[in-house]
């Protein structure tokens, strides 16, 4: 028998179970918002306009005309050439990333129409090992650019990457030269390359194809650079300027051409592509 018991107060608030995933926190303003409200806004924070990260498939749905995207090079997968192992085997990491994202590697490539203009479109999947560039990513990009040369099409690459994939060592670094060389052939044919930088675009991706666009666009507040700001600050032992390595800072210093809201990106790409190319009317 309990000698003491807490008297239940009338009208006391009862605990309400809230469905997991119903709310989402903005990484920028730290506000907690109703997830459905954020989804309706195109995965953009209604409070501060910060663009949340989205998957490659979501990005393709935003940019490609409905039903126009034809994926290419979908069967390429890494063979783990170094037999790499850290805390986990590289093969296990690839398998887990594929199960998590539904992608075979960190980039999805194909041909699409963007506002009626045919183009080769490549979109990074940051959820796949941080969008890192290994031999498969470099090969898919190089083949896609070669396809653009063969079909005389412009190229649009949407980057979201932490850089070269360390599990592939020098083979991943070689992809920087491979993609840059492919883009040189594209330029020799007089074909345009539009580079779209999203949060984050860093490391070997920034140091190669991401900054080689004829027109370089970025989403608001995207982190863009080679080494991260913390590493740079510790190396030079000096405070960094406010907003350093964010897209607004790069635009102010002439490193990129445009900052475009996600909801306006497709129309902006369409207008730029139409300047270089004749739009193809949709088939009846």
Where are these predicted regions, by residue range?
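N-terminal alpha-helical interaction blocks
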Residues: 1-14
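Residues immediately within or flanking Cys/His clusters that coordinate Zn2+
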Residues: 23, 42
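Short cysteine-rich clusters marking metal-coordination/redox-active sites
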Residues: 26-29, 45-48
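Cys/His-rich microdomains that often coordinate metals
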Residues: 32-33, 51-52
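Long, charge-rich boundary regions
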Residues: 53-129
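A structural preference for short, pocket-lining loop segments at secondary-structure junctions
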Residues: 112-123, 140-164
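Conserved mixed alpha/beta catalytic, RNA-binding, or beta-rich assembly cores of soluble enzyme
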Residues: 126, 133-144, 175-176, 182
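Conserved catalytic cores of soluble enzyme domains
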Residues: 159-280
């Amino acid at each position: 028998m309990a000698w003491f018991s807490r008297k239940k107060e009338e009208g006391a608030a009862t605990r309400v179970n809230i469905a997991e995933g119903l709310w989402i926190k903005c990484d920028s303003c730290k506000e907690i918002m109703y997830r459905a409200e954020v989804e309706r806004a195109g995965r953009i924070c209604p409070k501060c306009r910060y663009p949340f990260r989205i998957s490659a498939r979501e990005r393709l749905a935003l940019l490609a005309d409905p039903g126009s995207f034809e994926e290419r090079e979908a069967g390429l997968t890494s063979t783990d050439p170094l037999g790499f192992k850290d805390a986990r085997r590289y093969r296990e990491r690839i398998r887990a990333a594929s199960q998590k994202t539904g992608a075979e590697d960190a980039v999805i490539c194909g041909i699409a129409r963007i506002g009626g203009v045919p183009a080769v479109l490549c979109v990074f999947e940051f959820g796949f090992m941080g969008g890192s560039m290994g031999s498969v990513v470099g090969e898919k990009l190089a083949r896609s650019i070669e396809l653009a040369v063969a079909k005389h099409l412009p190229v649009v690459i949407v980057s979201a990457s932490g850089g070269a994939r360390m599990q592939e060592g020098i083979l991943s670094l070689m992809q920087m030269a491979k993609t840059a060389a492919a883009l040189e052939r594209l330029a020799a044919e007089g074909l345009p390359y539009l580079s779209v930088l999203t949060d984050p675009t860093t490391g070997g991706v920034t140091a190669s194809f991401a900054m080689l666009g004829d027109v370089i666009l970025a989403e608001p507040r995207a982190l863009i650079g080679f080494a991260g700001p913390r590493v740079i600050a510790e190396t030079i032992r000096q405070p960094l300027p406010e907003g350093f390595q964010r897209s607004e800072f790069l635009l102010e210093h002439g490193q990129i051409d445009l900052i475009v809201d996600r909801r306006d990106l497709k129309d902006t790409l369409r207008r730029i592509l139409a300047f270089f190319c004749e739009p193809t009317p949709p088939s009846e």
